[in-house]
């Protein structure tokens, strides 16, 4: 598995994307309800969303996620978290003490790592943990189908920190997160 953090500028053909998303829609879910909604932004819409998200981060707005974001990893999970961050920043030749470079690298999350498309997964909030499990299954299926077609992807939890611009752009009701 690879989380791609640098993408080609060329968009994926619409019919290819539609076929992949259609196939992914058949992912299993609890009681076969397929509770996810997938919102895809490309072109000018994606750029507008990127700009709004970066503006939120640059203005140091406080994250306002729809779901619990305040997870403090402990034990082996914390070790893996630090190991992952160390591997990432080492690959980018950014030292631990280079805070500004780390912040700039982190900012690329909200620029979607320059991917030509961004897919955002939402679900009704009341579905809680079962909905999260279903979205995880869907996300894995989508990732594998994309890879099968030679298309890289990167699952980004960071985007959930600032749902406001996404909610506004796609006119999401309050009960969806």
Can you describe what each PLM-predicted range is?
Residues 1-177:
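Acidic, surface-exposed loops and disordered segments
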């Amino acid at each position: 598995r690879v989380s791609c953090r640098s993408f080609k500028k060329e968009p994926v053909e619409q019919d290819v994307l539609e076929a992949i998303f259609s196939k992914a829609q058949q992912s299993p879910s609890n009681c076969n309800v397929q509770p996810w909604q997938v919102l895809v932004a490309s072109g000018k819409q994606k750029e507008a969303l990127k700009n709004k998200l970066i503006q939120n981060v640059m203005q140091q707005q406080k994250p306002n996620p729809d779901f619990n974001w305040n997870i403090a990893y402990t034990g082996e999970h914390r070790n893996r978290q630090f190991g992952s961050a160390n591997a990432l920043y080492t690959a980018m030749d950014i030292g631990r003490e280079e805070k500004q470079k780390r912040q700039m690298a982190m900012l690329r999350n909200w620029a979607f790592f320059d991917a030509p498309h961004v897919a955002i997964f939402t679900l009704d909030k009341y579905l809680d943990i079962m909905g999260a499990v279903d979205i995880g299954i869907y996300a894995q299926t989508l990732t594998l189908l994309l890879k099968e077609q030679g298309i890289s992807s990167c699952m980004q939890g960071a985007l959930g920190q600032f749902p406001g611009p996404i909610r506004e752009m796609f006119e999401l009701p309050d009960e969806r997160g």
